[in-house]
């Protein structure tokens, strides 16, 4: 089965991973299998993870002797494979365009569908959260995860409305948020954009999953193994940047006015390149969703895993 879209920064990720025959690469976010196919084309083997059972159809036709798909979160990769089992790990974060484009998955505020937003098949839905969470918790989700400045206003309005009728559909909630904020008034993005992002992150526990997944990658990688992470918003990127900076031993220099900074364990990663790399203008023109993508990459050293760190 062919892939319905080309993943963001695919060539940059493959180049950074340096796959080759005899090497095992983990595709932690299989999706439609774009990264996996590119990695398999180099002769490497791939173990792919995805919590969404519907993606299994995209594994049809892949070489059984070099490919395995595991229905699990990528944070479980070390539990499934064991420590030191992989030569590379690729993580493409955020909701896939495949999920966004399927109205029945409930991610989009542009198409009507059930208010779901789950990347997997189990757990509370976005409707459960919207209809039962305390207003203060909803406001926190919108503000922290969605970076929505009108978080309290939206949460209070939702709490009043759900007493009369619960929210069940995506467009129903999106239209309500738009009206609660007084319409678009020339806004560049839909008024529900940030609130929907916050709900999606909360429903799927995306940030805690990312933190756990980075630690799992540290455990599963062999020395000289490579970790490549593509993020799509500042919340994800800050977590990845902080993790790699700390694990690479790049702690802030101490001040002469403050106690000396305590040195951590030996660096377990070495940055493959400084900072983050983004998509080319050509890629952004072909796929506007790529605009905010950032790639960070590092190489596993032979230092022990940071057992006392999250």
From Swiss-Prot:
EC number: 2.1.1.199
Annotated compartments: Cytoplasm
InterPro entries: RsmH, SAM-dep_MeTrfase_MraW_recog, SAM-dependent_MTases_sf
Entry keywords, A to Z: Cytoplasm, Methyltransferase, rRNA processing, S-adenosyl-L-methionine, Transferase
Broad class of where this protein is predominantly found: cytoplasm
Record's catalysed reaction(s): cytidine(1402) in 16S rRNA + S-adenosyl-L-methionine = N(4)-methylcytidine(1402) in 16S rRNA + S-adenosyl-L-homocysteine + H(+)
Gene3D superfamilies recorded: Putative methyltransferase TM0872, insert domain, Vaccinia Virus protein VP39
Positions of S-adenosyl-L-methionine binding: 33-35, 50, 74, 92, 99
One term of GO molecular function: rRNA (cytosine-N4-)-methyltransferase activity
Record Pfam families: Methyltransf_5 (PF01795)
The family this protein is said to belong to: Belongs to the methyltransferase superfamily. RsmH family.
Stored HAMAP family: 16SrRNA_methyltr_H (MF_01007)
UniProt name for this protein: Ribosomal RNA small subunit methyltransferase H
